[in-house]
Every structure is written in structure tokens, then in C-alpha cells.
Amino acid sequence: MWLLYLLVPAMFCRAGGSIPIPQKLFGEVTSPLFPKPYPNNFETTTVITVPTGYRVKLVFQQFDLEPSEGCFYDYVKISADKKSLGRFCGQLGSPLGNPPGKKEFMSQGNKMLLTFHTDFSNEENGTIMFYKGFLAYYQAVDLDECASQSKSGEEDPQPQCQHLCHNYVGGYFCSCLPGYELQKDRHSCQAECSSELYTEASGYISSLEYPRSYPPDLRCNYSIRVERGLTLHLKFLEPFEIDDHQQVHCPYDQLQIYANGKNIGEFCGKQRPPDLDTSSNAVDLLFFTDESGDSRGWNLRYTTEIIKCPQPKTLDEFTIIQNLQPQYQFRDYFIATCKQGYQLIEGNQVLHSFTAVCQDDGTWHRAMPRCKIKDCGQPRNLPNGAFRYTTTMGVNTYKARIQYYCHKPYYKMQTRAGSRESEQGVYTCTAQGIWKNEQKGEKIPRCLPVCGKPVNPVEQRQRIIGGQKAKMGNFPWQVFTNIHGRGGGALLGDRWILTAAHTLYPKEHEAQTNASLDVFLGHTNVEELMKLGNHPIRRVSVHPDYRQDESHNFEGDIALLELENSVTLGPNLLPICLPDNETFYDLGLMGYVSGFGVMEEKIAHDLRFVRLPVANPQACETWLRGKNRMDVFSQNMFCAGHPSLKQDACQGDSGGVFAVRDPNTDRWVATGIVSWGIGCSRGYGFYTKVLNYVDWIKKEMEEED
């Protein structure tokens, strides 16, 4: 609390001037020497100041001055804002004077003057009186400039706000009506509507001062920008009034409307424009006025609606729109598929799926595709077979059917147990665009070689030595080899050669792995065989029991040659079958041995054959011992022929097979392989018993299938 004293000169002589009080928000003012009697013949003015934006409020707490008529002798005078607020003296209850009591004195500005005046004495009827003086408190009170500026009677009023005034404790500020801009003086306003932006989904827009007359010289731009996918609708309200001319369209003032940068209307006059569907989320309203006019302007309400896309329509009867909706709007989508057996096509590209999305401009983001019938393409070629259409020839589309078949009688279709060849070969073009069989799926059938069925089986009974030439097709499995000299073999399947191991690794030679392997098939004449060409070998497999270094032991004399490429079977090239039971080795059973070996001590140029009986093993064993031979004759061998016969296999026939016709199946079986003997036409011949090696043969062949 500031205690402010009016200082008195030492001699209490009359004093003049003013005493400023430091600017504070509150304080007190007293007479000199208060509460002791104040001096005579004294006058001074106390200047009370509070911060700008506040008023001064003064209240006397104690007041005791010499009373007089009209407060002529001693008095306190209060003034503010260049006006007197009164002259006061006396005490509360005195018959003379004018005490202030508890009255509140208020300035309009931030200053108040308190003048204290005393005369030369304080006597009453010759008696000296003592008066205490006064004690007053002041405080800063908020000044409502906005209220005071409406009272323009002051000589120096505050600058007025042109439009709106806003008071706050200690000050005020000005603002402008919509469409106007506060100027640098912070009080005056100027019309400004060149860049008004509206982003709400709905609202009202009007000219300045609507419905009062709009200001002159306006260049207004009202922009409405809403979210993508919304379209704006404009509805003008009454009254609508823009200066016009009867003969010239909108020469003075005009309202122009643009949607997406395109002018969709220019309006003036008193006729309200029609409701506008802009089909856009961006609209600009340009309002221009000249320097004169007294029209009320315009007012509109804008609303938004989600933009809609046209109903999707298919291009053909095979396209399906899933869950078709009655209406599609922004961000909605539809999925198109095809009926079974058809596929989506966009341009020339095949689609696995199709989705179209409604865009913010009311269009679909991609065009409707079409559906094209699934095409399975050309059926795969069947090796050693072919196919025929059971539906329209050459048509490979959905539901087309083909029948695969094998080239008979040389091949037959591989079938599952209990199924027919006709079922195995039927393939249908499926809805997935793939040729399929009900049992095998996508995998095409397999044509297997037919074994042991020559189209021209042998009928003659002549023998190799003393016999005649074989005819084409008599022994279509016959193989001519030239490895370490002439040899033979038999075709198994369409890429395997069955032969004797000793033709690859002769007993009288050291083991060789780099010998040339020349193999010929498909003819009965050596020269013609050479013309047909050699068949490259992919792999050689010799039975592990074969021992090249044991000259008198032909145990395991069996080998397989895998051709690099499968051969194409025909009347002169067919495989022979493998045995499956012991009856093929019954005593006396007749078999045929064919070959390109020595004939009457001459090399044969044509294939020849001999018919021999299966001999008694004991007789063969006895015959061998009579020759003082130590050759091994095991259970994996059998013998054929007879010492009394002058026919036998000879050099160059090794590796060929002992072929027997199975009367039950009418198929030819390779029961033995020409292995060893003593000379030519000098007794029995010895053969590898193929039945004992069938498991090994099948295992070797299956490893490569």
C-alpha cells in the first residue's frame, strides 16, 4: 500500500504546484500531517495516475475540513477529464460545508486531480479549531473503451472502431464484419473478399452487408472446396438483387459461377437464379461491383451430395457382376466374374480377377471387361500315339473333348486296374482352361510298347547252321552289335537292349570301359542296318555277378544297354517279352535263336535263325564232363540243342536271345541269352536263364523311367 503524504514547507507558508504519484493500480491520499491537523495557508494538487486502459476510482475514508458556505475557506477539489467533480469541506453531519461521504468518484481516463486548499486560519468565534484533514483510497478500475467511444462529447475521445469494439481488462481491440479487413490503424475496416474459402460440407454465402446494400468497387472471390467424391448444389435465397440494365446483360455488377474452372452461369437483376447442380467439388463465385448502386445483393445455401457412378453394364451375356447394387457412389466398387468356362479379358490381357472403383468424378476407374470362353490350347502330342476330337474338329475351348489313342498294334495305353483304355484317353477342356482326364488329371496317358507280338512271326523250322534267312518281321526284336566284334541282343521296351555281359567285357580281354558301342536295329540285312544308323548308348548296366577274369565261369552273363533315345516301334522293330514262370524251361520246349553270326565258317550278311529244344540239364552236365571241361553250369543257366543235331548258335550270335512262343498269350518271350558253348554245332549251347534275372532287369529299367 502506497501512503502518499502532502509534504508541507517548514514554515507552513502557502505552497503551490502539483505532486505526482507513481503509476500504480491502487494507493491512498491524505492531507499533510494526517491524522494531525493540517497546516494553514496551504495549497497543492495531487496527480493520481493509473495504467492506460483503466479509470481512477476514489473514495474518502475520513474527511474533516473547516466547514464554510460554498467551501470558500478550506476545501478539497476533485477533477478529471478536464471536468470538476466537486468541491468538498466540513464533516459528516456539519450544518455547513459539503462533505463527500462515501461517494465514489470515477474518472473516464486514467488520471484524477485532487487539489487541497487551506486559508490563513481555522477559527470559529475566536476559538482556534483543529481539523484532521482527510484520508482517501484510490484504485484502478477497468475502462470500457467500447462504451465510452459511443459518447463523442469529449474533446479528445479515443479513436473509434469502425465496425466492432471488444473490451478487455486494461484495453480494447477492434474487428471487422465478415468480408472486411482491419487496416493498419487497427480501427478502420475495408471490404476484403478476394479469397474467401469455405470447406464445410454445407453452409451459407452472401454478399457483404446482405440484405443491406453491398459496398461499391468489390472484387470478391468465394471458393468452395469440399472433399473429393462430393458434388456441390447451390440454392439462391430471396431476396436476390444485383444492379442490372434493361438492354445490356449485367453491365454494372455481376455474379459469375465457375465449377472445375468452367463458367456455368453469370447472374444479375432481381430474378433468383435456378438451383445449380455443379457436378463438382470445387466451385468459385466471383462478384464484381462498380462504384455506384444500391442493391441488396444475394444469399445462397450450398449443400453436398456423394457423387454417383453409372450403373455397370456388361458387354456380353457371360459376364457376371457380383452382388449388383441399385446404386453406386464414390468409393463403392463392383467385382466382375465370368460364367464357368469363361475368362476375363481386358484389352488383350487375361485377368484373374476384376474390380472397378467409383472415382470422385463419377466415372469407374477402369472399363468393363469382357468374358471370353476358356481356350485350353492345342492338346499335347502323345508320344507313340495321337488324339482325335470327339467334339467339333479343331475347337479347343471349354467342354471340348478329345480321345487319345496309341498306335496299334505296336503300342498300348497304360491303364489302371479296373479301367478301360477308352476311359483313360478321354480328356475334356475344363473351366480352368486345362485339358483333364477324370482319373489322370492333367497328365496325358502313356503309350507302352507291346512286346512279343511280331506282325510276321517265324513259320520256318530251319536252323542257323543249315537253315535259311529270316524274313523281315520274323524277329523284330533282333539287335546287331559291334563292340568287340559281332554280337546280338534283343529289344526290351522302346529304349533298352538285353544282351550278354561277355559281349561288352569278353573273357579273353582285359576290362575296358571306353570301347565303342555300336548298336543297330530294324532290319535283317547288315548293310541295311548300317544305313539305318547307329543308336547311341546312354548307359551300360552289367550284372554284378559277372566276372570277366574267370574264363570258365559265365555266371551273371547278362547286361542292359539304355539307348540315348527311344526308338519308334513298327513291323520291323518290336520288343520281346520277359518270362514270368518256369514252364518256359520245360524239357523239349522248342525255341528260336537268331543272329548275324558265323554260318558254315562264313560271316553272315543276313539274319538267320535256328529252332532248338530245351535240353536236360543233367545230360548237359554229363556231356560237359565227358569233354573234360571245368566250365560252371549253374542254376542261372540252361542248355538247349543236342549232340546229334548239326545246328547251334555260333560266334557272332552271342547276346542274342532264346525266343519261345507262349501258346496261352501268343506272345514271344526271351527265356535265355546266348552265353557260351564248345565250338559251333558240336553239341549243346548254354544260355543265361533270364527268368532268374527279371527282378534285376525291372529294377534297372525302372530307375530310368
UniProtKB/Swiss-Prot annotation:
Domain (Sushi) ranges: 307-373, 374-449
Disulfide bonds: 71-89, 146-165, 161-174, 176-189, 193-220, 250-268, 309-358, 338-371, 376-429, 406-447, 451-577, 620-639, 650-680
Domain EGF-like: 142-190
Sequence positions bearing (3R)-3-hydroxyasparagine: 167
PTM entry text: Cleaved and activated by autocatalytic processing to generate Complement C1r subcomponent heavy and light chains that are connected by disulfide bonds.
InterPro entries named in the record: CUB_dom, EGF-like_Ca-bd_dom, EGF-like_dom, EGF_Ca-bd_CS, Pept_S1A_C1r/C1S/mannan-bd, Peptidase_S1_PA, Peptidase_S1_PA_chymotrypsin, Peptidase_S1A
Binding site for Ca(2+) 2: 142-143, 145, 167-168, 171
Residues annotated for Ca(2+) 3 binding in this entry: 243, 253, 290, 294
Any one GO biological process: complement activation, classical pathway
Domain notes: The CUB domain 2 shows a compact folded structure in the presence of Ca(2+), whereas it has a flexible, disordered conformation in the absence of Ca(2+). Ca(2+) could provide a switch between the folded and disordered forms; low Ca(2+) could provide flexibility to promote autoprocessing and activation of CIR.
Official protein name in the record: Complement C1r subcomponent
